[in-house]
Regions:
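The beta1-alpha1 cofactor-binding region of Rossmann-like NAD(H)/NADP(H)-dependent oxidoreductases
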Residues: 50-61, 93
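Active-site helix of classical SDR
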Residues: 111, 147-150
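Residue(s) in the substrate-gating loop at a strand-loop-helix junction
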Residues: 131
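N-terminal Rossmann NAD(P)H-binding glycine-rich loop of SDR-like oxidoreductase domains
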Residues: 15, 23
Length: 212
């Protein structure tokens, strides 16, 4: 089989930004790449699977589909995510839950799906994309920061669970990068007057830093 000696890699959030660049780089290095995202933006040499990472059944089905074809999964890179910004007191619980559903639980869903296969094969590499926001505690990005801190803490503990089975876990805490993430951020300046204009200034600074 042509793919027998090639690395089989899943990249989530591969339709844009860091995920798309990662998927392209892996393809160019000779890996067989499966890209999970809701949007199908075709990339030559990369297989798109329509997967919402918050849908555990869809994730499990996609992973099984890959195993049936390739018989293994060497690595997964969890890039799927988005950001919200605004004051905590003006952010709804539903908005906060949605942030965690994608950024944290989406990562958990994918990892849970691949772990049984990696454990059985005795090797694998899980790479979870976190952020400096996990440790920098950026105001008015509180729920985004919390979701990334959850990923980092989870990843350190997961590494201790699975390393006896030949599975490695890597956390990447990225800084500001110029991608479409800035335009996709769900921004809110509700309460800006109550906070002395600090919310709008903070959001503007975030956008400036990410574009430079």
């Amino acid at each position: 089989m042509a793919g027998k000696y090639k690395k089989i890699v899943i990249v989530t959030g591969g339709s844009s930004g860091i995920g798309r660049c990662t998927a392209s780089a892996l393809r160019d290095s000779g890996c067989i790449v499966y890209e999970f995202s809701r949007r199908n933006i075709p990339m030559e040499g990369i297989t798109h699977l329509s997967v919402d990472v918050t849908d555990e059944n869809a994730v499990n089905s996609a992973v099984k589909q890959i195993i049936q074809k390739e018989t293994k999964i060497d690595a997964v890179i969890n890039c799927a995510g988005f950001g919200i910004s605004g004051a905590v007191e003006f952010t709804s619980t539903d908005q906060a839950k949605a942030q965690f559903d994608v950024n944290f639980f989406g990562t958990v869903n994918v990892n849970k799906a691949v772990l049984p296969f990696m454990r059985h094969q005795g090797n694998g590499h899980i790479i979870n994309i976190s952020s400096v926001a996990a440790v920098a505690h950026i105001p008015f990005q509180t729920f985004y920061s919390a979701s990334k801190a959850a990923i980092s803490s989870y990843s350190y503990a997961l590494e201790n669970e699975v390393k006896p089975y030949g599975i490695h876990v890597t956390i990447v805490e990225l800084g500001d990068i110029c991608t479409g993430f800035t335009q996709m951020r769900q921004k809110s300046i509700l309460g800006d007057n109550e906070y002395g204009g600090r919310i709008s200034r903070s959001v503007s600074q975030m956008e400036h830093d990410e574009q430079n």
